[in-house]
């Protein structure tokens, strides 16, 4: 997908990986970048606007844990203004295995609900034009960091959901792919809690191993957007971008 002149909605576009990715997207010249985030950051929005004055950057407060109905209402406001949206990026995520319910609500249910809501506008069975979804998942969806099993499971669920969306594209007209960052230097990983305190030093131990910067991740994220491969499972690790092959162990045959 050529980013230039496109309309993009980015959920959690002001976070660690999210903000650097927003910067890279703005540099590529979309027509509109609509950022939905829980906490407003006027300085960050101003920076994005200054980076490329030709791009219209707007912000709406949004908590992904709200109902599908509330999300649909917000999206209607956006669609009424823009008329069309080309790409939805679902990027909300937390890493704190003390907060079991919220981890699942943000990392998985929020992605499902936001996706479900946008289908009201995109689903070709309802006369919609189709669209593209990029879901930020994680390499922990491939193989868990077992000290944070709740986080890892939530990302595995988001990845499975995305893979199903891609297979449903012939029915809905909506394509999808997953963005799976490796360990990236963000505030998310500098301090976080393991499940039941099974490893109090989990963050420290994790950062003893090679990582990547948010800029490296963001630059590869934009490459994945441009590649626009339905069903792709992108691994963004140590500054590299790789489409991985998913091993099939079972098939429903339906």
From Swiss-Prot:
PROSITE patterns: ADH_SHORT
Catalysed reaction equations from the record: a primary alcohol + NAD(+) = an aldehyde + NADH + H(+); a secondary alcohol + NAD(+) = a ketone + NADH + H(+)
Molecular function terms from GO: alcohol dehydrogenase (NAD+) activity
Alphabetically ordered keywords of this record: NAD, Oxidoreductase
Catalytic residue list: 151 (proton acceptor)
Enzyme Commission number(s): 1.1.1.1
GO cellular component, one term: cytoplasm
EC class (word): oxidoreductase
Binding-site list for NAD(+): 10-33
GO BP term (any one): alcohol metabolic process
UniProt: substrate binding residues: 138
CDD domains the UniProt entry points to: ADH_SDR_c_like
Assembly behavior: Homodimer.
Family: Belongs to the short-chain dehydrogenases/reductases (SDR) family.
Protein name as annotated: Alcohol dehydrogenase 2
Source species of the chain: Drosophila mulleri
Lineage, top ranks: Eukaryota, Metazoa, Ecdysozoa, Arthropoda, Hexapoda
Gene name in the database record: Adh2
């Amino acid at each position: 997908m050529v980013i230039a002149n496109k309309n993009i909605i980015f959920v959690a576009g002001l976070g660690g990986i999210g903000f650097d990715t927003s910067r890279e997207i703005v540099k590529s010249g979309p027509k509109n970048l609509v950022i939905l985030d829980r906490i407003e950051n006027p300085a960050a929005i101003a920076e994005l606007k200054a980076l490329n004055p030709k791009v219209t950057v707007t912000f709406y407060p949004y908590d992904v844990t709200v109902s599908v109905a509330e999300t649909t209402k917000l999206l209607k406001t956006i669609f009424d203004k823009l008329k069309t949206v080309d790409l939805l990026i679902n990027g909300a995520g937390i890493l704190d295995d003390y907060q079991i319910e919220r981890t699942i609500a943000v990392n998985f249910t929020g992605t499902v609900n936001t996706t479900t809501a946008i289908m009201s506008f995109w689903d070709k069975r309802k006369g919609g034009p189709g669209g593209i979804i990029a879901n930020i998942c994680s390499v922990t969806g491939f193989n868990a960091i077992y000290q944070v099993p709740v986080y890892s499971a939530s990302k595995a669920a988001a990845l499975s959901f995305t893979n199903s969306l891609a297979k449903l594209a012939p029915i809905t007209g909506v394509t999808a792919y997953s963005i799976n960052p490796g360990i990236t230097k963000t505030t998310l990983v500098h301090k976080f809690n393991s499940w039941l305190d099974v490893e109090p030093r989990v963050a420290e131990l994790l950062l003893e191993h090679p990582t990547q910067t948010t800029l490296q991740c963001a630059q590869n994220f934009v490459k994945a957007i441009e590649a626009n491969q339905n069903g792709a499972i992108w691994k963004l690790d140590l500054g590299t971008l790789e489409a991985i092959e998913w091993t099939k162990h079972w098939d429903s045959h339906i």
